[in-house]
Amino acid sequence: YSALEIKDDSYWANIERASQWDFNDMIAKAGKPGDKDEWLMTPQTVNAYYNPTTNEICFPAAILQAPFFDMNADDAMNYGAIGVVIGHEMTHGFDDQGRNYDKEGNLSDWWTAEDAALFTQRADRLAQQYSDIIVVDSVHANGRFTLGENIADQGGLMVAHLAYLNSLEGKETPAPIDGFTNEQRFYLGYANLWAQNIRPEEILRLTKIDPHSLGKWRVNAALRNIDAFYSAFDIKEGEPMYMLPADRVVIW
């Protein structure tokens, strides 16, 4: 950052110089191998990411706190929260964008034609499923725009749930807490991450610009495709969260 000059004369001028430095830094990297030691987020950022060009997942220190991770919470809640986030980022390596990169981070078509065709078939069904959602009034979600994140949400749920079940091998089933079984608490841990109460105007704005589905649908739409969720809450045909088995889509 030695070329970046910060002065006490003007806030706007500092922002302008910082933006110009950032632009120049990105341009200077063009045509060069990716720096696999570079982080794209600060330690203070409450978020996580997968970088396909370096084939790595990153979890800044700030995300290791409630509601994502709680030292005092039971394993089910933590697996359903930070566990799903970890699985989510892992799955990005195999979503509609990440699958185009090989293990070295090169843009390369490394899938067999058969695998690619089956993936596309399932992905198209999942995209349509989300596009059928009405977010407000007569406005629909954009399942194609949010496809990568929806695949990652589903993959994260599947991977984290499997990891949680593996952690219970040879142990007694945990006793219910607050009236909820351990299986139910796994999904409650996930749902708790995306609780959201926003105005219709914000719903419309996010639907246009955010590649993630709205919080409500990151939970409800994702879980309706997962058989284990039905078992955990004993969901029956005719109930709001029920979806016919033939209509459920699982990518991975």
Region locations from a protein language model:
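Intrinsically disordered, low-complexity linker/terminal regions across diverse proteins
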Residues: 1-252
